[in-house]
Amino acid sequence: MAASTASHRPIKGILKNKSSTTSSVVSTAEQPGKSVDEELSKKSQKWDEMSILATYHPADKDYGLMKIDEPSTPYHSMVADDEDALSDSETTEALTPDILARKLTAAAAESLEPKYRVREQESSGDEDSDLSPEEREKKRQFEMKRKLHYNEGLNIKLARQLISKDLNDEEEDEEMSETAAGESMNMEESSQGSATSDQLQNKSQSS
């Protein structure tokens, strides 16, 4: 009898049958006590965000960053001439084209070179006065050589000129050799042509 019941019972597979899923849906619909929210809560997960933050992002964690205890960049105050320009810009008067044009011409009339560079040049002039005449000459020659060495634009132009000159010379040599070869071929053809014409004349006279 055990063998007969085993043969009548279907073999269960791993996958769910369509009939079993539809029967479970029908059974859940028949149970009025369960709400839709309970069904959704079974299918979805709830995250405890506060415990995640406490675990992975604690308040005392520094993430490998460190604070820099350096002073901020020093501030250079403006020169007295620039303070007037600043006070003009702080006024609330409306800018007309005439006022703007006057301010632009006044700014253009001032030195175009920044004031810090003027100070830098003055300090370099002091260094030159401390040097002996021989050292000054060496320094001047060194600066000239450095300018020539780092003048890459000029070097590129010179290299291009030399290359183009070499190419032109090669083309001229090729043309001259071709014309010389062509002339020699023409001379040979003309000499052969004159020889054959002489032979034809001799034959015609002898006959």
Curated annotation (Swiss-Prot):
GO biological processes: glycogen metabolic process; intracellular signal transduction; regulation of signal transduction
Lineage: superkingdom: Eukaryota
Transmembrane segments: none
InterPro entries linked: PPI-2
Region annotation (Disordered) ranges: 1-44, 65-97, 110-146, 165-207
Spans annotated as Required for binding PPP1CC catalytic center, displacing metal ions and inhibition of PPP1CC catalytic activity: 149-152
Ranges of biased composition (kind: Acidic residues): 80-91, 123-132, 168-177
Keywords: Acetylation, Carbohydrate metabolism, Glycogen metabolism, Phosphoprotein, Protein phosphatase inhibitor
Residue numbers bearing the N-acetylalanine modification: 2
Region annotated Required for binding PPP1CC, chain positions: 12-17, 43-55
One Gene Ontology MF term: protein phosphatase inhibitor activity
Sequence ranges of Basic and acidic residues compositional bias: 35-44, 112-122, 133-145
Compositional bias per record (Low complexity), positions renumbered to this chain: 19-28
Phosphothreonine modified-residue sites: 73, 92, 96
Gene3D superfamilies, per the entry: 6.10.250.1050
Pfam families: IPP-2 (PF04979)
Family the entry assigns: Belongs to the protein phosphatase inhibitor 2 family.
Subunit-level organization: Heterodimer with PP1.
Protein name: Protein phosphatase inhibitor 2
Species of provenance: Bos taurus (Bovine)
Gene behind this protein: PPP1R2
